[in-house]
A protein has these predicted regions:
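Short, small-residue-biased leader/transition segments that mark boundaries at the very start
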Residues: 1-3
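Amphipathic alpha-helical segments within well-ordered protein domains
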Residues: 6-9, 25, 72, 76
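Terminal-region recognition feature
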Residues: 11-12, 66, 70, 99
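Structured, non-catalytic alpha/beta "coupling" segments that mediate domain-domain communication
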Residues: 14-43
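Amphipathic alpha-helical interaction segments
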Residues: 23-26, 70, 87-90
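Helix-hairpin-helix/helix-loop-helix acidic hairpins
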Residues: 35-82
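Helix-hairpin-helix
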Residues: 75-95
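C-terminal end-helix/capping segment
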Residues: 93-134, 138-147
Length: 147
């Protein structure tokens, strides 16, 4: 374990689990490697399901999906760790890729990712990818190209 990792284990503001710290560092490296294939945003958005969910009660909301299982498997093939299908599904919810807000909720549809017809707003997903890629390029310029 290097000095940086020991310092992280003593940081009370983060999870102090050595395996998870190593996984976070590893996943950052895997994210950088994905830039050669279009970047993490492009990779993630490739798993957007063809239809939205329509939950009317909390029990209708799954913990994982076919797409989150695929995403998890492919992320692991790319070297990512601690990215199971439940974690991938939570990511998909967090970025609006799937809308698990209950029908009738004031939050339903606020991401703009889904059209009222229930099909994806692919134009918006492309805008998200372009924004993510431009921010990645800016970070490279700011910190020097990743090696």
């Amino acid at each position: 374990m290097c000095i940086r990792d020991r310092r992280l284990l003593g940081d009370a503001s983060i999870i102090r689990n050595e395996t998870k710290i190593r996984a976070a560092i590893n996943n950052a490296k895997a994210t950088i490697a994905l830039r050669e294939e279009g970047g993490l945003a492009e990779f993630i958005w490739a798993y957007q399901p063809p239809e939205n969910l329509y939950p009317t009660v909390m029990e209708d909301i799954p913990k994982k999906s076919y797409e989150s299982k695929l995403m998890s498997r492919e992320l692991k093939k790319k070297g990512f760790r601690f990215v199971g299908p439940v974690t991938c599904f939570a990511l998909m919810e967090a970025i609006g890729m799937i809308d698990t807000h209950l029908i009738g909720s004031h939050r339903r549809g606020t991401s703009g990712v889904w059209l009222e017809s229930g099909v994806p707003n692919y134009g918006l997903a492309q805008e998200y990818n372009a924004l993510a890629n431009s921010q990645t390029a800016g970070a490279d310029e700011l910190h020097g190209a990743a090696s």
